Amino acid sequence: MQLAPAIPVLRIFCVEKAKEFYLDFLGFTLDWEHRFEPELPLYAQVHRDGLILHLSEHHGDATPGSTVFARVEDIVALQNELTDKRYGYSRPEAIHVGWGLQMEIADPFGNRLRFCQQIEG
């Protein structure tokens, strides 16, 4: 038996804001959306490269203010890509931490995406 990578579930409150942030700004791709009925809350999956996230409007699925820790190979390239988009609510910046580089970005719902690149040596 082998465990698969975890898929974090993040609470969202506005589908339009979530799509603007995760798809337009961060560059994720929408894989699928689900609603039990058209007026009911959204549950969706997005991905970028190997990082998969579930986004949910459902009250009991997740708590706002969660943090996702995601490893990246070139955090400076990601920082430059995101900065070039001139998103009005975030200007992410990689900082040095004891073991490498880290860049934390808050989504519109209080969740934090902590991108990290380990530096050898």
Q: At which residue positions do the language-model features occur?
A:
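N-terminal beta-strand motif that seeds the catalytic metal site of vicinal oxygen chelate
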Residues: 1-19, 66-68, 118-121
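Conserved acetyl-CoA-binding loop of GNAT-fold acetyltransferases
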Residues: 24-30, 87
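Short catalytic micro-motifs in class I SAM-dependent methyltransferases
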Residues: 7, 26, 114
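Conserved catalytic-core motifs of GNAT/GCN5-like acyltransferases
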Residues: 9-11, 29-37, 94-96, 120-121
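Vicinal oxygen chelate
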Residues: 14-16, 68-112
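Conserved short beta-strand elements that form part of the metal-binding/catalytic scaffold
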Residues: 31-66, 113-117
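C-terminal "cap" of GNAT-fold acetyltransferases
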Residues: 1-5, 13, 36-53, 104, ...
